[in-house]
Structures are given as structure tokens and as C-alpha cells.
Amino acid sequence: MRLIFGHDEYIANAVGQALGVTIHPPYTAIGFADASEVIRGGAVFNNYNGSNIELTMFAPRAVTKGLIRAIVNYVFVQLECNRLSARTKRSNKPAQVMLPKIGFKWEANLKAYYGKEKSNDAVLFCLDRKTASERWLNG
């Protein structure tokens, strides 16, 4: 996969549409394109507060190590964040399996975050600077 930069609004809209959510600016985005230059997914970063930034991501295929390193480099090296947060619907079991495999830790369940039904609760995960450095930057 090839990484695409400089098309934040287009990528954020594509990710939001794929996930059925609206992503509000300000944000920065990295797109994932296939060999034919078609954007197949993306990572959108928003709600930056100096210490934390949130990740909204859509990737129809497996997430590659190169992609994870690009995300970790942006968040922990360029922005110098202490943590990266990711929320997913309780019903999104693939994300809940993948996030811990790449170093995210469960933090909380957020009741009725996406809607009334229990399947619309959110699950909050965090990747901290120490884990990111050990697994993705220095490892």
C-alpha cells in the first residue's frame, strides 16, 4: 500500500463514509492507496489537545506494519503526543481484536455513545508513548 498525504478532506470524507460517521475538522489524514492509486482506506487524526490525539481509521484489508509505523511516527515523533486514542463500536469485533495486537490497551466502555442499542456502545482503547516506542519505533 502507498501512503497518500495532503488530501485531508477527501480522505476524511472517504473514511467517514465507509464507517457511516461524520468526521469534523480540524483533522489531518493519511490515505492508503493500492497499486492503481485508488484510495482504499485512511487514518484520520483529530481532537488533538497537545498530549492526546484521536484516530479514526478504515482499512478494508489487513493493516500493514509499515502503516502502523507511519501512524506511530506521526503521533509520537512529529506531534510528540503521549497517547493515541481509538474508539470503536462494541459491535466491531475485528477492531477490538486488532487494536490490542498492535499495542492498544482497553480503557473504557462508553454507554450509548453511537446510539441507544448496546451494540452502539463505544469501546475506548489507548496506545501510550512507551508501548509505541518499544513496539514500533525502537523495536
Question: What annotation goes with each model-predicted range?
Answer:
Residues 98-99, 104:
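Conserved active-site tyrosine of GNAT-family acetyltransferases
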Residues 1-21:
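Short amphipathic alpha-helix that is part of the acyltransferase structural core
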Residues 77-88:
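Conserved GNAT acetyl-CoA-binding A-motif
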Residues 105-122:
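Conserved catalytic-core motifs of GNAT/GCN5-like acyltransferases
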Residues 86-96:
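Conserved beta-strand-loop-alpha-helix junction that forms the acyl-donor binding cleft
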Residues 20-34:
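A short helix-loop-beta-strand connector motif used in the catalytic cores of GNAT acetyltransferases and
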Residues 37-46:
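Conserved beta-strand in the GNAT
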Residues 48-61, 87:
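Conserved acetyl-CoA binding element of GNAT-fold acetyltransferases
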